């Protein structure tokens, strides 16, 4: 491993890892759309205009920075160290997944795609993606296991209210793993017009990098808030 380079950014330009555990294990049909997304993301994450656009929407739409507060009662109850909390639930939609969804929609707009698809289990990733898609004028398709749809009706209703098409998946266990597979199949068949948003740090390497890059907004805010509150970032003891 290279020193002082995050593990997530190591490997070659297309995310390939060599050595004993290396490889780019995706079906041949996924290779081209994944490589296209990798090239686009590697370019835009260094583009000052794109970063400024991202930061503008994070501030004026997502609601960054979110609060950093001391939990006075819990600190007094437990004693010893001060206990603080980063209130990420302050973000638009109430979940950290809004950062990833926002960046994916910005990438989709830059690539000229009109549709964005995504998978969801509990419904939060789907809800955030439906919100971002509505904000940026994209059609949104959310794949969700039939069992999860029955369990998570509030989030299903929220997605539909935002204009998303919620597509039930009846194959396999009818849960998230099957929704991911169906979403990927749809993306591969429609990659000329459609972008895909993976809701977490899973899947092909580029999706992991996009998610990490997007949600690192939380840690950037936290570092600034720590310095503002304590004068420096607390050291591990």
Segments from the language model and where they lie:
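PLP-dependent amino-acid enzyme catalytic core
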Residues: 1-237
